[in-house]
């Protein structure tokens, strides 16, 4: 092999190795939950916790199972501000990197939980609170698409 071919092949090999994440080369990975502790979660749902347990038994790939466990409940764990205002549920969902709620995105973020609302009264109230909040926002400014909580 001549020097030019050697350098070309070596460069390609090094380039290929740099595109492979180091963790993918490690065989014995531990998939530890990255969810916040229960006391730090912004909202909890027994139906969501049950579906996570159920789905994890069906997913054979340990990493995909871990991803599902961490990603599916993320909206509830980290972005929900639920309270009662004048005796009615009110749900504000942070939908981006600032503490604001986009109407379209807040709807999209609760969409995966809709099949579970018949099983969990807390989820029903969360969705009702979101509808109440979105109604207030639209009445405040029908042309805006994002709102702060205040």
Identify the role of each PLM range.
Residues 1, 20-54:
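C-terminal segment of N-terminal export signals and the immediately downstream linker at the start
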Residues 95, 100-113, 130:
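Long, well-ordered hydrophobic secondary-structure segments characteristic of membrane-embedded
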Residues 73-102, 123, 147-148:
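Internal amphipathic alpha-helical repeat/solenoid segments
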Residues 5-27:
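N-terminal export signals
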Residues 122-150:
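Helix-terminus loop motifs that line ligand-binding clefts
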Residues 47-59, 108-121:
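Well-ordered alpha-helical scaffold segments within catalytic/enzyme domains
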Residues 11, 15, 76, 117-118, ...:
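Hydrophobic/aromatic-lined pockets within catalytic cores
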Residues 42-84, 133-137:
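Amphipathic alpha-helical dimerization/protein-protein interaction segment
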